[in-house]
């Protein structure tokens, strides 16, 4: 089966207007899935969403929401290490995910803390996410942990290596916790895509893409996309792919190149 592409409605189809209108525009362009950032928009650059209107648009068009972000953005490692708001809002996020039919919530690591060893912080993340998974047990919502690049977009973030996301996922050891592999972040960090995907294996539960350099649409940078999707397919991943990029042209037109490649990957 061809890969199912999910445009990020924070960045794509903004020409259509509000988020629910972007869902309709994506569907009109032939997409059957979309993704988004935080549902309530408490963390910039996400903005608040009319959840009932968004649900109506998803239902009306038969569009699948593939992923949303956890809220609020949490600095897990920075003293005093109070995670209560994260756990409280996690339940709210799961309720919204259920309402919108979204099977995944994206989580992160926050900023690393210079006063603690890296390994200690990774092990703390395991405990934090074990508790999170236990809290939402029975929800059928999967938490996916994203490593991000620190060279360009997220300086100071603790998790900047796919291998460390995989380490945390192995430690959590749950079918409802896995790795979000972002090919853009991985490439910017200089990782070997094939090696990282092979090492992470079936821990990869979601994928996002953008070209590099620039974080524009596939075809705007230097990534060899036929090769990249071939590597992804060879790794065994057959789930949806989020299109999380900043388009340099009209949204639908910006998707044409990667849609052609994904159709035969």
Give residue spans per PLM region:
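Gly/Pro-rich active-site loop or hairpin
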Residues: 15-16, 20-23, 76-81, 155-162, ...
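Active-site-proximal loop/turn and secondary-structure-junction residues that shape catalytic pockets
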Residues: 11-13, 38-40, 71-74, 109-113, ...
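Generic enzyme active-site microenvironment
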Residues: 33, 144-145, 180-183, 187, ...
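Catalytic-core regions built around general acid/base machinery
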Residues: 50-60, 128-136, 196-199, 227-231
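Active-site acidic/histidine proton-transfer and metal-coordination neighborhood
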Residues: 57-60, 76-178
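N-terminal pre-domain/capping segments
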Residues: 1-103, 174, 246, 252-265
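Conserved beta-strand positions in the central sheet of alpha/beta enzyme cores
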Residues: 35, 67, 106, 144, ...
């Amino acid at each position: 089966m061809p890969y199912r592409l999910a445009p990020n409605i924070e960045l794509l189809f903004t020409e259509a207007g509000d988020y629910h209108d972007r869902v309709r525009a994506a569907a009109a362009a032939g997409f059957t899935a979309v993704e988004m950032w935080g549902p309530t928009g408490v963390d910039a650059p996400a903005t608040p969403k009319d959840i009932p209107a968004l649900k109506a648009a998803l239902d009306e068009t038969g569009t699948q929401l593939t992923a949303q972000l956890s809220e609020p953005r949490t600095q897990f490692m920075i003293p005093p290490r109070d995670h209560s708001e994260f756990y409280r809002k996690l339940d709210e996020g799961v309720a919204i995910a259920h309402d919108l039919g979204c099977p995944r919530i994206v989580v992160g690591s926050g900023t690393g803390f210079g006063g603690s060893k890296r390994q200690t912080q990774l092990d703390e993340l395991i405990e934090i996410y074990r508790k999170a998974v236990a809290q939402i047990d029975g929800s059928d919502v999967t938490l996916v942990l994203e490593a991000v690049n620190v060279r360009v977009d997220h300086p100071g973030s603790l998790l900047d290596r796919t291998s460390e996301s995989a380490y945390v996922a192995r430690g959590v050891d749950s079918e409802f916790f896995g790795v979000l592999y972002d090919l853009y972040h991985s490439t910017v960090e200089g990782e070997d895509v094939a090696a990282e995907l092979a090492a992470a294996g079936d821990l990869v539960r979601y994928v996002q893409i953008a070209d590099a350099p620039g974080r524009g649409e596939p075809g705007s940078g230097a990534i060899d996309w036929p090769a990249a999707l071939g590597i992804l397919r060879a790794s065994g991943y057959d789930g949806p792919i989020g299109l999380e990029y900043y388009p340099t042209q009209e949204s639908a037109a910006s998707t044409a190149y990667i849609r052609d490649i994904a159709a035969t990957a």
